[in-house]
Curated annotation (Swiss-Prot):
Main location: secreted
Top enzyme class: hydrolase
Disulfide cysteine pairs (residue numbers): 25-40, 146-159, 169-193
UniProtKB keywords: Disulfide bond, Hydrolase, Protease, Secreted, Serine protease
Protein name: Chymotrypsin-2
One GO CC annotation: extracellular region
Organism annotation: Vespa orientalis (Oriental hornet)
PROSITE patterns the UniProt entry points to: TRYPSIN_DOM (PS50240), TRYPSIN_HIS (PS00134), TRYPSIN_SER (PS00135)
Any one GO molecular-function label of the UniProt entry: serine-type endopeptidase activity
Swiss-Prot/TrEMBL catalytic activity: Preferential cleavage: Tyr-|-Xaa, Trp-|-Xaa, Phe-|-Xaa, Leu-|-Xaa
Protein localization: Secreted, Extracellular space
Gene3D superfamilies listed in its UniProt record: Trypsin-like serine proteases
Active site annotation, chain numbering: 39, 82, 173
Amino acid sequence: IVGGTNAPRGKYPYQVSLRAPKHFCGGSISKRYVLTAAHCLVGKSEHQVTVGSVLLNKEEAVYNAKELIVNKNYNSIRLINDIGLIRVSKDISFTQLVQPVKLPVSNTIKAGDPVVLTGWGRIYVNGPIPNNLQQITLSIVNQQTCKSKHWGLTDSQICTFTKRGEGACHGDSGGPLVANGVQIGIVSYGHPCAIGSPNVFTRVYSFLDWIQKNQL
């Protein structure tokens, strides 16, 4: 995240770091699954999921990936249907610092709404990965404005923007975009990084059926 601040311990108990063996993507958790971006899973086999800590160098609990589930309509050229699940080898044990994320029950998010993005992505292009989880408040951008910058945009995607110098960067992919404690987006792509163009997220609401079907 470019332009963010250090997240306090325990504020985002659903946020996880995917490692192979170093941090490469974010994700969010349910009892047995991690929700992330498809592009974080393609071509990877050894995944570990680290939960419960805002510091990368302080591992609270680590779970091994048992199965990687990529949405079969994921298109790596157009970057659509960029959603995936990791089934971990055992149930994630919940504590004060480890909690499942809530998923949306309706598609009520609209342009101008404030949303919170968290992640351990780079703090500028080719910059370092921060040790402390970063947080930033962004705004939802209307689809037309976003389409003018990302022509292939579909209704199953959603965009954010605030100003130049704020936004997602490499390593934030797969991480959660949250409105009022409900995850509405998954970090998908953007023009790297924070150069004044909207970030694009997979719209979680559009994939609720897929998520349910695949969390067996």
